[in-house]
């Protein structure tokens, strides 16, 4: 029915991985455990270490011959819809996909704060000041528990220092000890020390690094800078595995999404598409490759005509209820906030096209991006599952 990859929330998604981890720490999870790594395979380990390398796509890793990570590759998983950090990385912190956590992209129409919001830094679309400084509480937009609430053992979050201070991280990691690190190399130093330290309890340690994502956005997927950074991260993980020998630790390396290259020619601007802006009640939200469109009722016919003519080369478009009913955002009970945040129509971009609005992306006119994610190609949607036992 669809010409792209849908998330497999039944048994082969990052959500199912978190179900396996949750069940191993005696917390019931509403989704099935992962087909390739059940909770019983985790139960005997003293330390479960989850290393999330933002952007490390499955297809990219398969091209890295002789790498330590490729040698320890177990299988491939699907990301969430959208294949983006706010939607997918939040899974590693809450255990659940957008259907439950309610986040729909880097920007979203957040009724609780009365406007378009950048979720992770918790700022308005037009400013850098955190909304908490103006009286808004992130608890009002996040009504899901952290994954760690109810775990019977110690939990740790290791993350880059600036991000550790965000309201979002303080909310989703509030049941953990947050350890701030200056760089990804410092994250590995903290991991080595923590794993080697003695503990009377089992531990779940979640480390997140995003340098790989940042460098590719501005340099491209297969450029020298990207490949050099991968090789260094690969060496660091190999050294960590060597250091952890004899500690009864299971290292799990995964990602939130992959990435594809795009060019200046594949970048579309809302202002350049005749009639489209006039159809919308508010600016586009979501991500540049999965776009939420809130359409004026009297302009629905015009909007559909534009989609089926001018835009048909560049994207598919779907009514919101189709994507929710077809389980793009997850399974089970739907977070009511999702209905406010998903557009009346959702555009999923074809090939390597992106659609931008100058309101949310003015910076990219000055510093163009060379790679993107967010949508449903196999490069974006498939992520690796790497498993290393350190007995």
What does each model-identified segment do?
Residues 1-391:
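Feature captures the catalytic ectodomains and active-site-proximal regions of enzymes
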